[in-house]
Amino acid sequence: MLTAKQNMIECMKPGGQPDRYVNQYEAIKLLFHPFMFSSPAPQKGQLNVVNAWGVTNSFPDNVPGAFPVHTPDKIVVKDIEHWKDYVKAPSLDFPQEAWDQCKAMYDAVDGEKAFKAPFIAPGLFEQTHHLCEMVNALYYYVDYEDEMHDMIKYLTEWELKLAEGICDHLHPDMIFHHDDWGSHDSTFLSPSMFEDYFLDSYKQIYGYYKDHGVKYVVHHSDSYAATLVPDMIEMGIDVFQGCMKTNNVPELIKKYGDKISFMGVIENAFVDHEGWTDEECEKVVRETVADCGMHSFIPD
């Protein structure tokens, strides 16, 4: 019987022979890096916590996660034409003790059974709308192209320095990188605009990781992003995690399954609602695995 890690590798590789469905995150151990400890984040019930980028986040009791607060007084970028006056990248110079603390977590994982994957968030697109506010950011992508290109370059350089520290000190064999690129039914940017702003930056970031020991890139975007799959492949993404059913994953597997795998489809709306039943959950899971199969697909 294959280990969870071996089975996931067989699922992902062309012509692989997995001996069972990949069991969600069984083969992926999400781990920390020092920046996660140095940037304040709200715990459930906490409001208006300012992180290392100056973004204010809240985590009310009645929601599943924290989110940026964008009342006018809390938006970081007050004037996009002078964004450099507002956006100040936090330091990534950490003492060796901080790296050692994280390395102990990596060393505790059995690398034969699971991937060691640092969790990296937010991604480039998310960071722009965290700093600017979502509607503002989308407007700036259309009317302030030079400023947004420059901001993304600045964020990319910071991410590359983060990648350098992670690879030099922690030596992961996988990364789990977060950047939501769409809603339930559409991407936030057209494919051509997305490529113009993000393709080269992510090729640099994911290319750096793969040039320094990382074998697999899992990119999280719990959204529709089917039209961006060719770009994901070019960026070096191995798993599109969080893909909604609206992506028509069986068709994506037929078209791209020899180049990228897909993790998702079982949406919360189908199985996590008031009055849910075991029978209903089982029905959704069985239908999903029947539609998508065992190769290039991880039910989640």
Please place each PLM-identified region on the residue numbering:
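N-terminal accessory/capping or targeting/presequence segment of soluble
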Residues: G16-S58
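Active-site loop segments of alpha/beta catalytic cores
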Residues: M1-I28, V50, K88-D300
